[in-house]
Amino acid sequence: MVSFLLGIAANDNWASVSGAKTAGAAVAATPTARLWRERLPWTCGPETVLEALAGESHLCCLSGVWAGGGAMVACEPLRVAGPDADPFATLDDLPAVDTAGVDAWGAVGGGWLGWLGYRLAERVERVPVAGPRPAPLPDFHLAYYDHLLRRDAYGSWWFEALITPPRQAALKQRLEHLRTLVGDQLAGSAGPRPTPLRLSAAVAQRHLHAVAACRERIAAGEIFQANICLRLEGEYSGTASALLRSALVHGRVPQYAAAFDTPAGGIVSLSPELFLRRLGRRVRSGPIKGTAHRPDDPSRAVLSLEQLQSSAKDAAEHVMIVDLMRNDIGRVCEYGSVYAPRRPTAEAHPGLWHLVTTVEGRLRAQTANAALVRACFPPGSVTGAPKVQALKVIAELEPTGREVYTGAVGYASPLAGLELNVAIRTLELAGGRAWLGVGGAIVADSNPEAELEEALIKARPVAAAVGTSVIAE
């Protein structure tokens, strides 16, 4: 397990990277940190804070229902996990925290924030994850922030920090610096827009062939279901945080939205789906499977919902993935503790209806974050059943490879636990380009043309949220 001293290099595996530290294979005892919380007199939204901090290193934001609601904004991390680190073990490299004399209710304090890309499946299931890499982003990005700005569910802003003696003076300076930057910002504005996100005729045709081939695999008994995806592409030269700012200004942010600026590029995840939420020994997942267009007209929206709820195809997709998620979580939970209701809940999202089921369990004693994530990664709702064989089928059939898309995005905190989304509806940004992956579950009675249209239905609200559109050639 990779472990580090807070603020102190443990050996020569440290190097300076863009103002942060990069961790290699250092092993050291993690000291106890002290929680510091200070309420701030701000009444603004996270879009204003993001615009004020636009020049800061490794700026990131989680917005929606993360850690109980509100938002968190962080920048200037203490260190960044290097390419040789174990990304799963890194999620456990957290300090013990002394909260004596501090109201810690709802606090995050700090921790690891970032993403785990889909290609990390190779480290978990030992199967090849093939396909081209159009977006030149790392397989994972995890940065340790010992301080952040937290907006709670009631709209109050807090400066939160995990203080160790070597960092006490520096963190006081950081608070004053952030006060000055945000205090001078009047209101957040929308950032630059990408060009329209295009689906080329060639990619669309390959997707149709992939869906048809997947149905043949199902008919042959190789798999029951696989999630087959494609990518749209556009031009964009701004930052990820600016793109999320646009979505926030337009009020089109789902439950598990996130943005990360890194030297290699960035991501904007407008995901509605919870992969894992762990607090103590309780763990929860919210797999989504079953989607329908939700028209603006209320009567047509109700009709669309009724059709979704009565769809045998969507019900079959959903039941299989819920069972898969129960099995994955059950690998690290106490026997008999995993529970899911018999019927899914229909949730309304921008332009869409989704069927969602909450799966819950109680982890076995001493279960680490790494063990939990490894047991469930990559998310079942974006792979298929049986999972390992579905991974192989996906690698063989999909027209483009996956990177951050369909992995997971979120945080690991010593106070707030672990929370990761499923990185769907996620834009990957690098080199002046923007890529959006979309797809859907393929089962025995899937229709290739209908599956292609469902992918575009999912893409359009994401494009609208960031001020652009979708063009299918």
Question: What role is predicted for each listed range?
Answer:
Residues 2-473:
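Extended alpha-helical targeting/anchoring segments
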